[in-house]
């Protein structure tokens, strides 16, 4: 039934979407994709299993096996990120389409000032596998993986400034 009629639950914390921590926005995005994309759950579970293994290696300082997990984490992370990006792009386009429909005679003009962007969790210009290898010393010190899809976020900007710094919570 849920595959035929996809929906995203809205609850009392949803109003604070822009103000909530990144993991809240990731979870809401992931739930929506899970409903609409058959292969998403497999990629999601595979990525987070690989992340857990890599973080265990970092915590226990067993570097000899980290390269295998870097590759697995990177491969699954790219799949996961591509699904998130595609879904986000479609949702964003639909959002702006709806705003354009209601905007001509309403108070929704301020929505045109807001830019909604997806941050994938690492520099888009860099290869994730290379980045994991390059940041290995930093990750070892922190005993966890510092970049990847588990750090992705949806950002709300007004004139390239984080909307949370400009708007009040009610706005």
For every predicted segment, state its role:
Residues 1-56:
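Extended, charged alpha-helical "arm/stalk" segments used for dimerization and assembly
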Residues 60, 64-171:
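Conserved NTPase motor "head" modules and their coupling/switch loops across ABC/AAA+ ATPases, GTPases
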């Amino acid at each position: 039934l849920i595959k035929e009629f996809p929906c995203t639950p809205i609850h009392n914390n949803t109003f604070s979407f822009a103000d909530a921590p990144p993991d809240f926005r990731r979870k809401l995005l992931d739930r929506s994709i899970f409903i609409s994309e058959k292969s998403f759950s497999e990629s999601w579970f595979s990525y987070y299993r690989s992340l857990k293994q890599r973080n265990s290696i970092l915590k226990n300082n067993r570097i000899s096996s980290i390269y295998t997990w870097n590759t697995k984490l990177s491969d699954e992370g790219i799949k996961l990120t591509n699904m998130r990006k595609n879904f986000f792009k479609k949702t964003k386009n639909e959002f702006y389409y709806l705003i354009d429909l209601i905007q001509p005679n309403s108070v929704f003009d301020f929505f045109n000032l807001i830019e909604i962007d997806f941050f994938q969790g690492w520099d888009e210009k860099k290869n994730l596998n290379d980045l994991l290898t390059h940041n290995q010393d930093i990750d070892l010190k922190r005993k966890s993986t510092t970049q990847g899809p588990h750090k992705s976020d949806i950002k709300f900007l007004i004139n390239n400034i984080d909307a949370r710094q400009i708007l009040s919570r009610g706005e």
